[in-house]
């Protein structure tokens, strides 16, 4: 297998949880490298559904080591809640490790996130309100607290006091709300710290040892390429790097140790929150995709905006991630449509644009140029061999491969882990 990375190629919600669960089963170590509990993976094992937001999906297999890397911003309350949920389901947590240098989401981060969205009004970004952005802001501004800072009570108090001097100034003077009390925060977080303490370690060293022992490592991505702070539809993005480059900075593993980068692409396109979406379908087809695909956020429950597959977006993801293969998910959701459209470029004024534009104002003014393919009526959820797919479904897959020059090696035909087609990497 080698060491693999799974990344989302779109605006998140591509079905990475299922693909991760499929591939992580052959790994020895499963690692989260960025984001926070704003992400959500749904994994179905033996008919039981697990919704994970922070903990790697390898936790469902007791023989695997699971790592939350330094690039993740950790909300102790959310993490402990997730740990308790897994314990209640009989899942062991002895194989879970948390980076000592991961930054911590504090109560003021969540409050500031919501207050800032409210202040922006119509100009809001559409965050999950979980404090992710403010936590990353403090990390870059060098005033954040890391997991290791919470382990010693005196150190925690001193660093929290310094942080609150700034945060309370912001809360009182800018947002006109009551300041936060240091004793209340200390008391609340003390409980979480004791639960997390046995799991905290230098995860970069742990991963280095795994590499030296020739263990297979699987890096589990969160969100998607178009939510990347550098390569996404800025400013309608997250505050981290969900792209493959985030693996190295978010785990302490060098790029030479990454063998494959698998891009997960949904057979149609979805988006949660604000921002331009050229292929969005505000019609019956969009509603059908949403209902049939159960397109509601795992983390927020918000209905997702739905549209046709966008090739310029996928080409962009191939380039910035260095994708070596694709996993196409939810092909079954397209069954029953009379025709299926694929955006191959954009019309902007009198110009034809075939690459994804970095200028969001241009993207907002783009009209999609479609290639129209005939649909298929067959129920494909039971198909396990590529050759058994309807001809028009195979034409759809081939069009994607021909346009982005990357092979589709996994095709999801249903929500279950086993409802998928596996193909060899070399595709004619």
From Swiss-Prot:
Binds 1 Mg(2+) ion per subunit. This is Adenylosuccinate synthetase. The lineage of its organism: Bacteria, Bacillati, Bacillota, Clostridia, Halanaerobiales. Its EC number is 6.3.4.4. GO terms for molecular function: adenylosuccinate synthase activity; GTP binding; magnesium ion binding. Its cofactor is Mg(2+). Homodimer. It catalyses: IMP + L-aspartate + GTP = N(6)-(1,2-dicarboxyethyl)-AMP + GDP + phosphate + 2 H(+). CDD domains: AdSS. SMART domains: Adenylsucc_synt (SM00788). GO terms for biological process: 'de novo' AMP biosynthetic process; IMP metabolic process. The active site is at residues 13, 41. Belongs to the adenylosuccinate synthetase family.
């Amino acid at each position: 297998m080698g060491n693999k990375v799974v990344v989302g190629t779109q605006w998140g919600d591509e079905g990475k949880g299922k693909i991760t669960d499929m591939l992580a089963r052959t790994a020895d170590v499963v690692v989260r490298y960025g984001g926070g509990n704003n992400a959500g993976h749904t994994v179905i094992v033996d008919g039981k559904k697990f919704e994970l937001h922070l903990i790697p999906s390898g936790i469902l297999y007791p023989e695997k080591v699971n790592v939350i890397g330094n690039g993740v911003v950790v909300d102790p309350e959310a993490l402990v809640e997730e740990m308790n949920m897994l314990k209640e389901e009989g899942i062991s947590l002895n194989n879970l490790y948390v980076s000592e240098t991961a930054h911590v989401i504090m109560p003021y981060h969540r409050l500031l996130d919501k207050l800032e969205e409210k202040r922006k009004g119509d100009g809001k970004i559409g965050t999950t309100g979980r404090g992710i952005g403010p936590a990353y802001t403090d990390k870059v501004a060098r005033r954040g607290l890391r997991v290791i800072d919470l382990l010693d009570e005196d150190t925690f108090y001193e660093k929290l006091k310094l942080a609150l001097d700034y945060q309370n100034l912001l809360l009182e003077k800018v947002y006109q709300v009551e300041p936060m009390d240091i004793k209340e925060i200390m008391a609340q977080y003390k409980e979480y710290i004791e639960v997390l303490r046995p799991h905290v370690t230098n995860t970069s060293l742990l991963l280095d040892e795994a590499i030296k022992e020739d263990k297979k490592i699987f890096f589990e991505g969160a969100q998607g390429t178009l939510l990347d702070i550098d390569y996404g539809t800025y400013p309608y993005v997250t505050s981290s790097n969900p792209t493959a480059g985030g693996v190295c900075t978010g785990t302490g593993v060098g790029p030479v140790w990454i063998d494959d980068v698998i891009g997960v692409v949904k057979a149609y396109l979805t988006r949660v929150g604000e921002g331009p979406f050229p292929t969005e379908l505000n019609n019956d087809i969009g509603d059908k995709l949403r209902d049939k695909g159960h397109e509601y956020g795992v983390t927020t429950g918000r209905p997702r905006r739905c549209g046709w597959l966008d090739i310029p977006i996928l080409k962009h993801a191939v380039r910035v991630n260095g994708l070596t293969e694709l996993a196409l998910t939810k092909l079954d959701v397209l069954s029953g449509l009379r025709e299926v459209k694929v955006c191959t470029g954009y019309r902007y004024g009198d110009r034809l644009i075939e690459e994804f534009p970095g200028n969001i104002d241009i993207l907002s003014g783009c009209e999609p140029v479609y290639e129209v393919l005939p649909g298929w009526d067959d129920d494909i959820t039971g198909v396990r061999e590529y050759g058994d797919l309807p001809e028009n479904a195979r034409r759809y897959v081939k069009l994607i491969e021909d346009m982005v020059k990357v092979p589709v090696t996994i095709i999801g035909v249903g929500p279950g882990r086993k409802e998928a087609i596996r193909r060899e990497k070399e595709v004619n």
